[in-house]
Amino acid sequence: MKSVEDLEDKNVLVLGMAKSGISAALLLHRLRANVLVNDANANQPQELIEKLENKGIRMVLGEHPTNILSQNKIELIVKNPGIPYTNPVLVDAQARGIKIVSEPELAYWVMDSELIGVTGSNGKTTVTTLIQLMLDDNKKHAYVAGNIGVPATTVAQKATAEDKIVMELSSFMLAGIDRLHPHIAVLNNIFASHLDWHKTRENYVNDKMNITKNQTKDDFLVINWDNTEWQELAKRTQAKVVPFSRQGLTKSGAYEIEGKLYFKDELIMEADEIGIPGEQNVENALAAIAVAKIEKVSTAHIKQVLTTFGGVKHRIQYVENLNGRQFYNDSKATDIEATQVALRSFKKPVILIAGGLDRHDDLDRLIPDLEPNVKEVIVNGETAEKFKKIAQKAGISVIKDSSRVSESVEIAYQDSKEGDIILLSPAAASWDQYKTFEERGDEFIAAVQNLHKGE
């Protein structure tokens, strides 16, 4: 395990616990830093508290004290990606000139492996997973890490120089990088998202583009070519640009023409052989194909992965067929674009379960995708009233309220007919009612399973 920065005896604040905060704190302790963990939530699992206490790692829980930096002579902050830079502790740190980094940045400081970074507004987890499956073999290992739910600092310590790390990087994570340098960076797409955190679209785009800021001419940027703005963004990189296009706009990378997927002049497979539904997954497949071909993976193995891959949990995840009704869990659809993608994946009648945290998005953009197939909308959460209005505009006559996702499932099943799709795709974050989108999706799955038990 390398270390590009001497952290011995350095006073380091880990801001925010969660899985990544715990992992970062343990790594810093291993590097002989003086570690202090701070989280505004005092109700942390006892086993985590004991894990840190057993290492002699100090904790301040229940608040973010304004004097925590001066009182502890903090020299470096490793922050949870969800904590905004407007947090008073971070405002104070910036005024004092204290370096603030994200957990993936810390991981990069000790990483021996080649790094492949994946970002984008939608499809990151699917692309990350596909790349890992394509690169992993009996001789070398490929690990996933980052926003996919596996702390980067955990993986960085166990992966060897012969291995590869495929890291899903959110805009929140990329806002806090300094030296992080992927050999291959993937930009899947960029839509207006998380503007409550980034404040402006320009800030959001700039944070996304941090994925390529340290790349050189010896590296690669795999980028979606189906939008002129994204083509312009490619001009910012020093890396070799490898485009992918579902519209067949380029033949210099991965692309689709007439239902066939190619890399440069080589036919890879038929698009309808991909094991997961939806046009967005053709796009995700093309991004993964481009990376795999840069890494010299055989076409046979690429095809084997794409034909057998069953999808990622909470991302248009097929749950069950109950009396001819198909249930899909798309809890990860925390923005409008993701729900648009989900709705376009189905041609059968859809009962949509939607709603969540109100981030003041323009929900009217959903109307063209509601009109063709959505027969009923069941709403919950802060955006419930706004969803009712756009459903009415879309000409949907059946619009119902529910208190939680579990109740929505019961209503949807009662109202459904054989052949219907019952889809959870909230077009909103979960934080008004649930800690995470995973918790929301798990409630959906459990509710479907309860229906099955009652049959």
Swiss-Prot record:
<keyword id="KW-0131">Cell cycle</keyword>
<keyword id="KW-0573">Peptidoglycan synthesis</keyword>
<dbReference type="InterPro" id="IPR013221">
    <property type="entry name" value="Mur_ligase_cen"/>
</dbReference>
<dbReference type="GO" id="GO:0005737">
    <property type="term" value="C:cytoplasm"/>
</dbReference>
<dbReference type="GO" id="GO:0071555">
    <property type="term" value="P:cell wall organization"/>
</dbReference>
<protein>
    <recommendedName>
        <fullName>UDP-N-acetylmuramoylalanine--D-glutamate ligase</fullName>
        <ecNumber>6.3.2.9</ecNumber>
    </recommendedName>
</protein>
<dbReference type="Pfam" id="PF08245">
    <property type="entry name" value="Mur_ligase_M"/>
</dbReference>
<dbReference type="GO" id="GO:0009252">
    <property type="term" value="P:peptidoglycan biosynthetic process"/>
</dbReference>
<dbReference type="InterPro" id="IPR004101">
    <property type="entry name" value="Mur_ligase_C"/>
</dbReference>
<keyword id="KW-0963">Cytoplasm</keyword>
<dbReference type="InterPro" id="IPR005762">
    <property type="entry name" value="MurD"/>
</dbReference>
<comment type="pathway">
    <text>Cell wall biogenesis; peptidoglycan biosynthesis.</text>
</comment>
<keyword id="KW-0067">ATP-binding</keyword>
<keyword id="KW-0436">Ligase</keyword>
<dbReference type="InterPro" id="IPR036615">
    <property type="entry name" value="Mur_ligase_C_dom_sf"/>
</dbReference>
<dbReference type="InterPro" id="IPR036565">
    <property type="entry name" value="Mur-like_cat_sf"/>
</dbReference>
<dbReference type="GO" id="GO:0005524">
    <property type="term" value="F:ATP binding"/>
</dbReference>
<feature type="binding site">
    <location>
        <begin position="120"/>
        <end position="126"/>
    </location>
    <ligand>
        <name>ATP</name>
    </ligand>
</feature>
<dbReference type="GO" id="GO:0008764">
    <property type="term" value="F:UDP-N-acetylmuramoylalanine-D-glutamate ligase activity"/>
</dbReference>
<comment type="similarity">
    <text>Belongs to the MurCDEF family.</text>
</comment>
<dbReference type="GO" id="GO:0008360">
    <property type="term" value="P:regulation of cell shape"/>
</dbReference>
<keyword id="KW-0961">Cell wall biogenesis/degradation</keyword>
<keyword id="KW-0133">Cell shape</keyword>
<dbReference type="Pfam" id="PF02875">
    <property type="entry name" value="Mur_ligase_C"/>
</dbReference>
<keyword id="KW-0547">Nucleotide-binding</keyword>
<keyword id="KW-0132">Cell division</keyword>
<dbReference type="Pfam" id="PF21799">
    <property type="entry name" value="MurD-like_N"/>
</dbReference>
<comment type="function">
    <text>Cell wall formation. Catalyzes the addition of glutamate to the nucleotide precursor UDP-N-acetylmuramoyl-L-alanine (UMA).</text>
</comment>
<dbReference type="GO" id="GO:0051301">
    <property type="term" value="P:cell division"/>
</dbReference>
